[in-house]
Amino acid sequence: MLKPLGDRVVLKVEEKEQKVGGFVIAGAGQDATKTAKVVAAGDGIRTLNGELVAPSVKAGDTVLVESHAGIEVKDGEEKYLVVNEANILAIVE
């Protein structure tokens, strides 16, 4: 399992499938955002005064993230996206 540091967040991106004439085209389209599930969040970031500011998201949250944000990593067979919390646009409720 990945444990992010600082204000980084590990996401599992929800893949969209588009069907055209019975064929499935995975990842079709160039959306500006992606929907993802938060798998893990770091402890937060420290202010100049040394105070720890906890992340706004937690494991299990569904979030909207910029489509080109972060770094894709593999943990075993699973693919995850590691992003800075600032790249998360909203929590989907």
From Swiss-Prot:
Gene that this polypeptide is encoded by? groES
Task: Report the locations given in the UniProt record.
Answer: Cytoplasm
Q: Which Pfam families match?
A: Cpn10
Question: Where on the tree of life does the source sit, at the highest rank?
Answer: Bacteria
Which purpose does this protein serve, as stated in its record? Together with the chaperonin GroEL, plays an essential role in assisting protein folding. The GroEL-GroES system forms a nano-cage that allows encapsulation of the non-native substrate proteins and provides a physical environment optimized to promote and accelerate protein folding. GroES binds to the apical surface of the GroEL ring, thereby capping the opening of the GroEL channel.
CDD domains from the entry? cpn10 (cd00320)
Q: Keywords, A to Z?
A: Chaperone, Cytoplasm
Quaternary arrangement and interactors, per the entry?
A: Heptamer of 7 subunits arranged in a ring. Interacts with the chaperonin GroEL.
Q: Name one GO molecular function term.
A: unfolded protein binding
What the record says about family reads: Belongs to the GroES chaperonin family.
Give the record's GO CC terms: cytoplasm
InterPro entries named in the record: Chaperonin_GroES, Chaperonin_GroES_sf, Chaprnonin_Cpn10_CS, GroES-like_sf
Please name the GO terms of the biological process aspect recorded for this protein, alphabetically.
chaperone cofactor-dependent protein refolding
Keyword Cytoplasm on entry: yes
Q: Which organism is it from?
A: Streptococcus anginosus
- This chain belongs to the protein called Co-chaperonin GroES
Query: Would the keyword Repeat be found if you checked this record's keyword annotation?
Result: no
PROSITE patterns associated with the record: CHAPERONINS_CPN10
Membrane-spanning ranges: none
